[in-house]
């Protein structure tokens, strides 16, 4: 089991350099962000049938980055794929309190934010199959 990331990674968000959103398919965008060590972060945004957005593996954005995100739609759902992807979760939940938080296990708490539903169960109930789209990392 991988466990939680180091305490330093679970502290208040810090905005690192990031790209602009790149559209990889209709209703599907990706953004690459940096970290203070040689790994990259990839955030994926999906346009929902409601017109809102699903954010997968959130990256803290600059004000210009958030303006770009909000031009795509209103954030509705945030997916935490696993404990190493929680660095900016509390920041997003504070900025968008209406966000529904999906994660690996309902009831888990990451950085003070509770997972409201199991992402696999929600996708299954919605008859959604997850797969890696061409062009995504």
What are these regions, as identified by a protein language model?
Residues 1-2, 93:
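Generic N-terminal simple sequence motifs
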Residues 2-60, 114-137:
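Catalytic core of the metallo-beta-lactamase
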Residues 55, 61-104:
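Active-site metal-binding motif and surrounding structural segment of the metallo-beta-lactamase
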Residues 84, 103-109, 117-119:
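Short, polar loop motifs at secondary-structure junctions
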Residues 87-88, 109-112, 122-123:
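Short, well-ordered, mixed-charge alpha-helical segments that flank or form enzyme active sites
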Residues 97-98, 111-116:
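An exposure/low-complexity boundary signal
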């Amino acid at each position: 089991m991988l466990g939680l990331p180091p305490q330093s990674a679970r502290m208040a968000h810090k905005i690192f350099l990031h790209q602009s959103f790149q559209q990889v398919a209709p209703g599907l965008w990706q953004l690459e962000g940096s970290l203070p060590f040689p790994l990259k972060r990839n955030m994926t945004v999906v346009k929902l049938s409601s017109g809102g957005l699903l954010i997968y593996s959130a990256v803290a954005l600059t004000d210009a980055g958030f303006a770009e995100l909000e031009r795509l739609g209103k954030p509705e759902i945030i997916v935490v794929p696993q404990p190493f992807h929680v660095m900016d979760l509390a920041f997003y939940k504070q900025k968008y309190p209406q966000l529904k938080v999906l994660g690996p296990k309902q009831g888990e708490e990451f950085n003070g934010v509770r997972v409201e539903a199991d992402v696999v169960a929600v996708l299954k109930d919605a008859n959604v199959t997850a797969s890696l789209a061409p062009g995504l990392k």
